């Protein structure tokens, strides 16, 4: 992997690079920044937002957000595609992960510090973050569901967590006892995940606070930042420098700023995003960690995929608060790199197992695809922020691609097992193992690095908050499923939107729009990028102007029970990849609506050679049939497409002359495909997304 950065080409001096220009300008000045970040007395941190009104992220006061988030609690997902997943998440996944956390010693790590457990420390350096991500999932779940037992269980856990906090504010169960001298040292910052853990602590604390106003974990997290971090670390002459090591704290600090209104947290996020020249980093670290240098000097996505996605989230959050144009320029270039060179058709990212990293442009292997669940989630989170900054549907299309495919595949249908990686081809007879899944089972109930399971849980718990946004002009409708939104326009006028649909299996969507008082405003309807033909009607009258991959603006005076009817084109598309994607040459992928499909061995009529799917060929130019099977995999649409099975006679040598004929037999067959998200729910079996084709 080539490194485009020379470590000193972008560092002229510490004084020149320690303070981001957007911070050190008219808004505050260098002296004010150093005062804030040196731990000098500041106004007390207090409630800034109305905790009941915050969305997945709180953009209510973000000056450069074109769209404002709608609270998670303001949207109810009703019976339909996502309700099944969310019920499983609430009733099985979140409680099951609680039991896993206990049985694998994650809570014992806290309890041992207060004498409540004699168990030794267990797990890797980032084990604390597992508790915090699970707490964040609970926080989002409690925003839409009254679960007294879950609330009390979580509150008891949080009390035990907070009881371990030291007088300085420090709270981490790994860097204690004989490891205490390692706190925030150079090697610890780059690889020790201290700031990563506090970032997840902040996010979990904020989600719990927004669930019911409970500040227990939030106040503890603030004490960590105010009491331990700010007085000792930052750009000041008597402070030590900071490098995130694993980006995460940046977006958490911006969200803390949004929650409290205290700008010192925003400034600290900007300082970390900018990097500190006093901290020496090797070129390989700069690539892998995706931090430590000015974010605006980045030109491409590289290194650890989750780190880079989280860095982009933090940078976009910073832009939404500051409007720094250099950040937007960089983010736009990185997004182009993502969508043109690095994005799997399933919405997954991160091609390489080594380093869990991005590969070179167009390096998108299938069987060896890593596609970590956390990376797809981070990519979705980043696009959510880019959407808020721009109001452009191209970002929503990417969100939908990831959500329905590369994220949804990460959790089993029963909610009890998870994918760490999400390959696009699988052969159980081959070596499909990796360091997190040594037995190659693909889905497991637990990983010692268990970042993905609670990450998936928090994503599905927060899903209602992704359906809508508001602006000064009206309301944006991003995602489609049976749901009800009860919120208000920017002028305070109440608004209810009821969705009825069988999306994503069918393309018809009906909205009932009911403002509390008749009012003129714009309704922005997303026309998906995969839908070539679209119909939109309001109260039976056709509306023109619907363009694929854009928001259709319907501006009118709306009254109670106005009806919007949309019909999207659910034609099955056979997709080809750019020829530069070497593994996909001569192959096609099937997509219908937002769903990407795959072949899995149990569904094929021909069982000969059942260990793999290498002989199956799809016929281009023939029709695909779509059928809903209510009894298969909790109810899915299946595709049937004409094809053949090629059976080639064995050849004695590994290589042979091209002129030498090899006997091959072609057997007509019908290929059957299922949604990619549903694979590996019947045990490990051969699977492939990209299928060889023959033009007929």
What would you call each of these model-derived segments?
Residues 114, 120-122, 126, 141-282:
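Extended ligand-binding groove/face enriched in aromatic
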Residues 256-280, 300, 307-344, 376-378, ...:
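Active-site neighborhood of glycoside hydrolase catalytic domains
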Residues 36-130, 155-176:
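Low-complexity, Ser/Thr/Pro/Gly-enriched N-terminal "stalk/linker" regions
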Residues 113-131, 182-197, 230-246, 282-285, ...:
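Solvent-exposed loop and edge beta-strand segments that line ligand/cofactor-binding
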Residues 1-5:
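Secretory targeting signals
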Residues 43-52, 269, 331, 397-405, ...:
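C-terminal beta-rich recognition modules with glycine/proline-rich loops and embedded aromatic residues
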Residues 82-84, 135-148, 199-214, 249-261, ...:
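Well-ordered alpha-helical scaffold segments within catalytic/enzyme domains
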Residues 9-35:
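N-terminal export signals
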């Amino acid at each position: 992997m080539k490194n485009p950065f020379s470590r000193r080409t972008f560092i002229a001096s510490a004084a020149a690079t320690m303070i981001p220009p957007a911070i050190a300008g008219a808004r505050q000045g260098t002296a004010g920044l150093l005062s804030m970040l040196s731990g000098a007395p500041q106004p007390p941190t207090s409630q800034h937002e109305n905790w009941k009104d915050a969305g997945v992220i709180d953009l209510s006061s973000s000056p450069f957000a074109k769209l404002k988030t709608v609270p998670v609690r303001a949207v109810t997902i009703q019976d339909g595609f996502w309700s099944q997943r969310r019920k499983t998440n609430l009733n099985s996944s979140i409680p099951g992960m609680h039991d896993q956390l206990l049985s694998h010693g994650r809570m014992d790590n806290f309890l041992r510090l207060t004498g409540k457990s004699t168990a030794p420390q267990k797990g890797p350096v980032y084990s604390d973050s597992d508790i915090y991500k699970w707490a964040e999932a609970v926080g989002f779940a409690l925003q839409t569901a009254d679960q007294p037992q879950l609330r009390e269980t979580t509150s008891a856990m949080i009390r035990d967590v907070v009881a371990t906090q030291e007088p300085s504010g420090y709270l981490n169960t790994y860097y204690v006892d004989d490891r205490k001298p390692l706190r925030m040292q150079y090697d610890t910052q780059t690889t020790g995940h201290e700031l990563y853990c506090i970032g997840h602590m902040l996010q979990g604390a904020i989600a719990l606070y927004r669930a019911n106003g409970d500040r227990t974990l939030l106040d503890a997290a603030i004490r960590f930042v105010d009491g331990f971090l700010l007085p000792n670390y930052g750009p000041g002459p008597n402070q030590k420098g900071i490098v995130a090591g694993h980006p995460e704290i940046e977006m958490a600090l911006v969200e803390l700023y949004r929650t409290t209104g205290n700008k010192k947290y925003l400034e600290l996020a900007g300082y970390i995003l900018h990097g500190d020249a006093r901290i020496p980093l090797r070129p390989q670290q700069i690539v892998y960690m995706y931090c430590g240098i000015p974010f605006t000097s980045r030109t491409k996505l590289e290194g650890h995929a989750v780190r880079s996605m989280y860095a982009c989230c933090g940078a976009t959050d910073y832009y939404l608060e500051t409007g720094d144009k250099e950040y937007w320029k960089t983010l736009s270039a990185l997004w182009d790199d993502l969508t043109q060179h690095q994005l799997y058709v399933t919405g997954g990212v991160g091609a390489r197992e080594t380093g869990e990293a991005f590969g070179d442009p167009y390096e998108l292997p299938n069987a060896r695809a890593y596609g970590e669940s956390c990376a797809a989630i981070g990519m979705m989170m980043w696009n959510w922020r880019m959407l808020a900054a721009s109001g452009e549907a191209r970002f929503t299309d990417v969100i939908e691609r990831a959500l329905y495919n590369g994220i949804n595949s990460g959790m089993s249908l029963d909610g009890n097992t998870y994918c760490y990686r999400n390959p696009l081809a699988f052969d159980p007879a081959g070596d499909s193992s990796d360091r997190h899944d040594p037995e190659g089972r693909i889905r497991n109930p637990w990983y010692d690095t268990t970042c993905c399971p609670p990450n998936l849980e928090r994503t599905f718990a927060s899903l209602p908050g992704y359906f809508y946004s508001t602006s000064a002009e009206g309301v944006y409708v991003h995602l489609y499923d049976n749901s009800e939104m009860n919120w208000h326009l920017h002028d305070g006028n109440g608004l209810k939107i009821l969705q009825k649909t069988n999306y994503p299996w069918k393309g018809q969507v009906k909205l009932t729009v009911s403002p509390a008082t008749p009012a003129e405003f714009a309704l922005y309807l997303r026309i998906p990028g995969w839908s070539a033909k679209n119909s939109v009607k309001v109260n039976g009258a056709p509306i023109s102007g619907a363009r694929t991959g854009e928001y259709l603006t319907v501006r009118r005076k709306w009254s109670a029970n106005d009806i919007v009817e949309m019909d999207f084109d659910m034609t099955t598309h056979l997709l080809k990849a750019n020829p530069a994607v070497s593994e996909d040459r001569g192959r096609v992928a099937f997509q219908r609506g937002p769903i990407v499909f795959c072949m899995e061995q149990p569904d094929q009529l021909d069982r000969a050679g059942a260990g793999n799917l290498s002989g199956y060929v799809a016929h281009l130019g023939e029709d695909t049939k779509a059928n809903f099977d209510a009894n298969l995999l909790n109810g899915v649409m299946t595709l049937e497409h004409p094809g053949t099975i090629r059976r080639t006679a064995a050849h004695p040598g590994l290589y042979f002359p091209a002129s030498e004929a090899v006997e091959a037999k072609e057997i007509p067959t019908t290929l059957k495909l299922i949604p990619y998200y549903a694979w590996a729910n019947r045990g490990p079996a051969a699977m492939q997304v990209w299928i060889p084709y023959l033009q007929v």
